[in-house]
Amino acid sequence: MKLISFVVPCYNSQAYMKKCIDSLLTAGEDVEIIIVNDGSTDITLKIAKTYRVNFPSVIKVIDKPNGGHGSGINAGLNEAEGLYFKVVDSDDWLDETALAKLISTIKSHISAGQSPDMYIANFVYDKPSVNDTFVSHYRKKMPAGRIFTWDEVKKFRYSKMMLMHALFYKREKLVESGTVLPEHTFYVDNIFAYKPLPCMQTLYYLDEDIYHYFIGRSDQSVNIKNIVKRYAQQQLVMREMTDAYTWQQIKSMPKGLKRYMWHNLEVIMVNTVFFTCADYSKERVQDLKALWKHIKERDKALYKKLRYFSYVSFPMMLPWKLRGWVMTKGYLYLCKKIKLG
């Protein structure tokens, strides 16, 4: 049995995918690597097929028409057979030593008959252009080195999140969650790091810097120019997240999970309002009104909580342009703090 299914969605990734895949191959026969060619127009598919020839027992290749990052993850999950499931973007990579420790930990848990539903590990923001890094860890938020439940997860502050880069889901639990990501949409990692969580009842935090998240390409979705341009896609993601669970469902979750799910929603709602208000147009104003209306019509209790008792409540009281200015300054500060900008 493969311990981890790594899914690597690729679109025109010829320049950097080899570093990513080579870092995963260090785990050997304990893993499978599913390379998803998402309609690339360069030699991504050729590179993927070469890897499959050279490592036939480890590499799988899916060739599909372009459907966006979410569709690549969906396709990979459909083919995955490993005990755990992990998405690795094609311009990112995993640390060999830390990955070996994770594999060893998984084996130990299997031997003891107590495999957790989700592994959490640190990730590293890498910005090679300025030779700088920033490690995102969870040492103050949860116990390390043992299996625990959500009741032991402490409150997260605003800038701290369990992003997709940190999470290794048990595959059967991920499937059970019914998570299917929208196609042709950026920022779907927000959904992926939110919707499956209630199905993950037992957790294990491995305090190792496993995932290296590359920052610096001009076409990246976190680039502020792209954020402003792609606000409608972030709004779609926010709709998916608010549709996933009602406020009543969230309230009934275990304390630590309930607190984190709410924190997650608050943060992504702030991001959504920022994406929208970072520029002005009549269309943007109407789109934001439509988003709030959608949330209100589906779940009035969740609407009231988000609109009037969340991180976004104060910015929503400000005039549009001032709101956009304040939130942009906040985003740029956060970027500087974690080396995004």
Task: Kindly give the residue locations of the regions a language model identified.
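A conserved acidic beta->alpha catalytic loop
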Residues: 23, 37-47, 67-68
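Short, acidic, metal-binding catalytic loop of nucleotide-sugar glycosyltransferases
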Residues: 22-31
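Acidic helix N-cap motif at the loop->helix transition within catalytic regions
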Residues: 16-18, 42-51, 93, 97
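N-proximal low-complexity "stem/linker" segments adjacent to membrane-targeting elements
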Residues: 1-23
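Membrane-interface aromatic/basic loop that binds lipid-linked glycans or pyrophosphate carriers
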Residues: 277-341
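Donor-binding/catalytic cores of nucleotide-activated saccharide
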Residues: 69, 92-204, 213-227
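Glycine-rich, basic loop-to-helix element that forms the pyrophosphate-binding segment
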Residues: 64-80
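Short aromatic/hydrophobic "clamp" motif used to bind/position activated sugar donors
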Residues: 85
